[in-house]
Amino acid sequence: MRGFRWPPPPDGGPRTWGPGPGAPRTGRPALPEPETELVDTPHDVQLERLVTGVGEPVTVFAHGFGNGIATTRPFGSAVTGRRVFFQFRGHGRSDVPPGPWSYLDLARDLRAVADLSGASRAFGASLGAGALCRLLVESPDRFEKLVFLLPAVLDRPRGPIAQQRLTDLLDAVAGGDASAVADVVALELPPSVRNTPAGWSHLRQRLDQLLRDGLAAGLADLVEQSPLPDVAALAGVTAPALVIGCVGDDLHPTHIAAELAAALPAATLHVYDRPGFAWTDRADLRERISTFLND
């Protein structure tokens, strides 16, 4: 890791890795990662979990492909009650059971964590939104409130650009090359953020996590899959839902968010006008999610 040379720190210092003289000399230091636990599930897959907050209600948060607890926590920062974050199989310290894997397997992971935690509300981002959709086909009345952030796929496979991005991430992490991983992860950031202290801190955190924990090869099974046989299968879900999409995101097309909102009888759709809104419109996004869930 000390030989890492990409990208340059935002203050123009030497391109070296770590907390030494090459690290950014501006911006806040990254907070230490909280202590997580491994929980047993009825389907014999141990999953990594973090519980924050106190009281009721309880909200479970499901992360995106190649992401995890750390990148999902900010979305729940203003949500009241207990907040339950976890890692799907193949991510973090969670188990890597034999494959092949499907969205039904992810739905079982999500359902197990929700049941063990007593969650009455659910948040799903990207891959997590797909897993939540699959869970709702089996149990349409499981949750009282639902948030879907950047749904990526419903009843048709991802497009070729999105599939290639996910494959590139898996290949880079498997190869263990920090520069290759950084090239892929940097695409998550809007250009205006990439060479700032905040962007550098995010990139460093993501690289630390991905190169430490890796991503299971079984995740490749999911790249070409879709979670639903037909989006019409969600017609029985009557819980209030918030669906959040954006314009211009190759991994999360606007029409997927619109189709999901149309399929859910009690859904509200909000579409941001550009990718990277989790950075550029962070306060608005946090308020939008918390207002919906806290109401």
What are these regions (language model features)?
Residues 41-95:
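Conserved HGGG/HGGXW glycine-rich cap/lid loop of the alpha/beta-hydrolase fold
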Residues 124-132:
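Gly/Ala-rich beta-loop-alpha elbow adjacent to hydrolase catalytic centers
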Residues 133-173:
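Flexible "cap/lid" loop of the alpha/beta hydrolase fold
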Residues 157-159, 175-223:
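Conserved alpha/beta-hydrolase catalytic His-Asp/Glu region
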Residues 237, 243-245:
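Short beta-strand/loop motif that positions the catalytic acidic residue
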Residues 247-252:
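Acidic catalytic loop of the alpha/beta-hydrolase fold
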Residues 266-295:
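Catalytic active-site module of serine/aspartate enzymes centered on a nucleophile-bearing elbow/loop
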